[in-house]
Structures are given as structure tokens and as C-alpha cells.
Amino acid sequence: MRNLGIAVTFAVLLVIGYVTALEWDAVVTTDSGILFFDKNWTQISSGGHQFHHISAFAYDEVKRKLYFSDLKDPSFRIFSLDTKPEEEYHKVAKLLPKSDQTGYITGLAFDHLERKLYWTEKGTHSVYSVEVDKLGAPANATDGLINLVAQVEENHDLAALTIDECRRHLYWTNSYLQTSSIVRAAMNGTVLDDHKEDVYEPRGISVDHYNNRIYWVEKKYGRAFTVESANLEVQDRQTFLRGEDKIPTHVSPNSQYLYWIDQEDGEVHETMKSDSKVTRVVYKGSRPSALIIRSGLLVEYQKNNPSCKAVVSEIIDNVRKESSEVKDVAQAVTSKPEMITCLNKGILNHNTNSCICLPEYQGTFCEIPICNNFCVHGECVVGADSRPMCKCHAEFEGERCDRNICDGYCLNNGRCALSATGQRSCTCSKNFSGARCETAICTSDYCYNGECFVENEVPECKCNVGYRGDRCEEYTCNNYCLHDGTCILNNDTMLVECRCGSEYTGKRCEIPKRFCSLDNGNPEMQQYCEGVAIAKNLVEPQVTYCKNSFNRTVVYVSLAFTASLVTLVTILCTVRRMYERNRPRITKRFKVTNNTQMTSRPATQCEITIENCCNMNVCETPCFDTKILQKSATKAEDKQFLLDDIESIAGSYRKLPSCVAEKN
């Protein structure tokens, strides 16, 4: 009877406890308690101020309860906080007492289907679960409620935990340095994937049901950190964010942003999921440890998701069944009527006295069509995640078709136009070019000393006074005045002029003044010669010689005599050469018969020229015998010597005394 009375009292409180407080969208646990924020990250309330070391956090969106663990509490390890009415923000229920085997709870996650709370303990290296609706009894009555889900090795540090309720999977992180990993397991604890490659001290982890991915944070080597992402099978890994000098501990996504905690500077960061460079700090204060972004994701937005439809339907059936039971108990003790009525086939959740709407409706009473005035220039449809989506007209884009596709497309005052196929094109202003008019034709540094203007889509330069060149890069006075003339700028005409020296005149000091005495009829020369003193007529200079100088006539005669002498000697040598006796040239032919030994190539007869033997031994060849050449002999004698030598038995050498001696 006592337990029934408690249940009835609790049911009555649920019915009459209609939510009057401001709705919160985010909650952050800090050293000074639990802080509640609206969608603009303005703090609207706080609670649990007696807790200063909250280590883990989970949320029940059906009953709107927060579950958390505090490291320093001596008696209990899990607590709950009711977030429905404002006056309940400070009402904390003690759910699970500590025991001798209790370890340091590092992660909490809530399963709406089985209404179980899962957690990881660092000291016991274990994953546990418990049915939360059975908690709150005396300590000795909770021993049999706790279920051991998984036991990991001692060299594993369980750091965080999350649940994919739609596909019924658990994910936890192992932050031990040598064995760091991301683990995917079944709800009964059976490990399905243990991803270790390039994982270093992972910490907080969360499931993004909007994109079917998981996010986790890693404390990298030294000062670095990363926020990593992978699909639900822990594949297709991507580094979402990289940075330094921060200590990220927790991560939580919504449809557009990813929120993560930096314990180094006590900040909560908001980073756009589509562009990680777009980030801002939404909270800075007491040391944050965990956060939850409340979006009604499971019950409100996953009703049409094929992967979640069956699970969500079963959750709603459980809520309907429980609401009927609570309603019957409440009507038995009070005649107070229902405070709200759900429209458009909405379901009343008696636990929270609020409506669970169909996908097409929203609002407190499900009175607002979700597509009502949502699309500005397009048609609205309800997506698989129960969110409104727009099919925009050809000229518009954006989440709500509220932006013309030409807005901001053409830069630098370019005009945008649409083709028949909906393609954008730009007509650029005079000084710009490119597909979006993004390129300036005249840049600031094109003309060095002048003003740039566009002529036929080509940059041109109007030079400042005193400069010239295609890009005004040359000073006009450079090498302008010749013959050491001085270049100056005329202040009246703004043109350069030359101040010439005493010997020159002309526009550029190019005319010698002595030429001005010549009357050549050149008008250009005459205009520069006006006012120039006329010099005397040019005459042939008189040459005088000193008395002690040399006599050139003597020199010329000496040179002529020497040349004549050389010529005479040359003639005499030539004549002497012509009259010298020639060397004899004797040719004799030998006719070779069949009885003669062959000494040459086969032919009718073999011939040999005597002079061809001159390259033989000097004793065998008379033509190069130096003694014979020096001996005075008549031509007939010399010829006879050669003939005798050829016919000798020795063959081809002469019977000279020197050669005979050499033979002996």
C-alpha cells in the first residue's frame, strides 16, 4: 500500500506539474552546477549546485530527465534531475548507490527503447546497464538490477560511451596510450569492430543521426588535438577539425553544428558541420565537463527515418501504454481534467503532459503544420528525418528558398543573368573580368607611376609627368640629355628640357655649336643656332715642325732601298733553282713469264717503277744515297749506275763501297 501511495502521489505531481518554465535547448555541466541555455546560448536557469565534479551525462527526452554521475559523492554514483518545471531544476533524485566494486564512471548513455542506462567504469574496465524505472529503491534492493554488459582488458581505459538507438549499437572509446581504439559493439556487449589505426587517446564520442556518422575527440601528440569522424561502421574516417593548445573532452551534434568542450580554456565551441572553419565560442566560464544539445531528435525527427521507424514506433507505443496507466491512476485520485489536448492526431505523453506530434505537425498542441510558410519560393515536403524540406523554383535557393540564386553571385557590380537551363552568367563592369567578375583588369600595381584605365579590355597607363613607358616604369630624364646636358622639368609646359654645356646646343644637346657657322639650310638646326655666337670659318690647320724633329724623307728612302734589296734576292734564288740539274727518272719494265715467280697481282705482265723503290733501305736504293747526291757525276754515268744496280744478282742495291762493307 505504501508503494502504491507513492506511485499515485508521483502520478498526480506529473499531471499537475505542467511545464511553465522556459524551454531549454542546451545544458552544460560545470564545476558550479548544471547550466541551462536557450537556442541563442543565453543562460535561462541552473541547477544541481551541490555537484562540482560531474563526470558523465545522459538525457531521457521522453520523460525529460538528466542522468549524471559525480566523482566526489561518497554514497551514490548515479543521480537524476527533472527538467520539466522550473521549480524542479534543483530537485535531484539519488538513483544508484555506490558499492565496494564501484569504479570511476566515465561515460553515460540512455536507451529509450529498453529504458536502460548504460555506463563505463574506468577502474573496473567494464560496461554496465540498469533499468532506470526500477531505480530509487533502497541500496540492498538494487544489487540485482545492474547488468554487466562487457568486460575489457586491463590495459584499456574506457573514456566515453554513446548509443545508436536506431541500429542498436554501442560505441565506446579506449584512451589507453598503447591500445587506443574506437569500439562498436552489439547491445549485449559483443564487440563488432575495434578500430585502432591512427587512434590516439580518444575521449568523448557521439552519434550524429542526421548524417549517420559518429564524432569523437582525440588529444594528439604534444599540443595538438583533432575532432574525428567516421561512418556508423567506423569506416570512411575523416579529420573534421584540427588545432592546438586545447583539451577537448566531449562532443555533441545537432542538425547544423557540432558542439565540443575545451577544458583548457573552459569553453564550449560551436562549429558548422558543413564548414569546420566556421566556428565560435558560445560559452566561457566555470570549467565545463559535458554537454547535451536537446533537439527531440529521436522521438520528433526520426519517425520517418527508415532506419529508425520501427524503433521510434515501439517507443511511442510504450509511451502511450504508460500514459494510459498513469492517466488511470491519476483519475482515481483526482477529478481534475486534462490540462491540454493534442490536435491533428497527436499523442499525449502523461509523463511530461506534452504532445508527441505526427511528422507533419509541430507546436505545443500539434496545431502548426510543419510546412506552414516554411518555403518562401518553393514547395515544402517532409523529409525522412521529419524535418521540412524545400524544392525551390529555378531562380531561388537556400534552405527555405528565400535567396535568389543571382544574389551575390557576380562580384564587383557585375550583372547576373540566367540561361534557359538555369545556368548563371555574369556581365562584368569595365574594370573586371572572370566567370564571376572576380579578377580586376587594372590592379593597384600595374602602372608604376601613373593611372591605369581599361581600353578594349586591356589595361593601359596614363603616366604621371616625368615618366614614360608601357607601365610608366621609366623616368623621362634617364639618358635623355646628351653630352653631359642637364635634364629639367619645365613647370609651365610640364615637359622635360635640356640645359646644354658650352660646346653643344639642340633639343637634347646633340648639335655641336661649331656647326652653327655652316649654312646648310636645315631649319631644325637653325632654330637651335639662333643666338649662338658664330665661330670663324673652319680652315685647314697649319702644321709646323720643330728643328730637332726627324727627317721623314730619309726614312722613306731607307724603306724603299730595303724593299728593293729583298726583291732582288728573291729573283736570284728563283733563277738559280730553275737552272739546277734535275734528278734522273728511270722506268724499266719487267715481263714475267710462267717460269717466273709471281711477286705481284696476276695480270698479263707486271711492271714496277724504279722510283717507287726509293722508300726502301738507303743502301738498296740509290735515289736517296746522300753520298751519290754529293758526288759529281755526269748524267750518263748516273743513269748507267742505276741500270747496273737493277740487273745485279743482289737484286736492287748498288755495289757501292759503303754498302758492300755493310753487307760484309
Swiss-Prot record:
Top-level taxonomic group: Eukaryota
GO CC annotations on file: plasma membrane
Glycosylated residue positions: N40, N140, N188, N431, N491, N551
Transcription regulation among keywords: no
Cytoplasmic membrane side: 574-664
S-S pairs: C371-C380, C375-C390, C406-C416, C410-C426, C428-C437, C477-C487, C481-C498, C500-C509
GO biological process: canonical Wnt signaling pathway; oogenesis; spermatogenesis
Protein task: Has a role in spermatogenesis and oogenesis.
Similarity remark: Belongs to the cueball family.
Record protein name field: Protein cueball
Native species: Aedes aegypti (Yellowfever mosquito)
Source organism phylogeny: Eukaryota, Metazoa, Ecdysozoa, Arthropoda, Hexapoda
